[in-house]
């Protein structure tokens, strides 16, 4: 069950929706109540961004607790003028928390989220552990905030970062013309593989140094340091393999399956046809997607632009890039044009920050939606 504090707060507090960039002013219309918040994985890449966004958005916090693995337990983290001791998630007590944000991997979420939820908190989980559970809503607040009205397990799932980039774009187009097919190629940043992925790219670029130009005529000209995050060198390269291989007749990766299954659940289109190829690229932050979308009803490229120009979570841009989107909340969309293969088809190119809207921001927006 939800804590009494959270139930009372749901009635008494209203929240404004986010703007296009990280807000510089309070978004709360009322601060009659404040919440006890926890972050599991607080010292990690996404947990760090969560801490920043809670401050940027003036989330109503009474107290906050940080949890991490035993390696990070005992450290102190500065937050809004306070020094907060990091607790060991494995041995922590979970009483007197209202909302707990999880970003510590699927295994830990499977183990700890039910314990936290049974102690009275609402869990908002960033891992893949609960996304396809029929009793756990998978939520993008701009798309399906209504799903948070029923949370039988006190757990709400955050979608995969790649799926997230596309949802604010596809939902209004589906409402207009009825989405039928998606053909997607992704260009996923190294930060999607965690801090280790970012470090691996940085080390390989540094190793190449001034002789990187030698790769122009010989792809083996540089012996890169061995890496663990990607199956091939990522510097100056693209790797058409994200995640892990699923051993079935489709021979797809789990990243490709997530895009299909999560899109169907969030958009509530059970028969949506989705095929994807997920590619890792030498970018630090910002996932991009090349999408060909087929619709049940005719829709023009100009109509797509008109619709998306009115969506707060979307920015129209002639040439969307990861560099433009990094550190920014909305999805950048461009290269909008008719497709000549799919019936009623439209081509689009999207870029979005996989750490902000792709993970931390969406989790906090879910928390805000609970307070409406």
Task: List each model region and its residues.
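Oxyanion-binding "anion nests"
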Residues: 229-278
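N-terminal Rossmann-like NAD(P) cofactor-binding subdomain of oxidoreductases
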Residues: 28-234, 272-273, 297, 323-332, ...
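C-terminal active-site/capping subdomain that shapes the small-molecule cofactor and substrate pocket
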Residues: 270-372
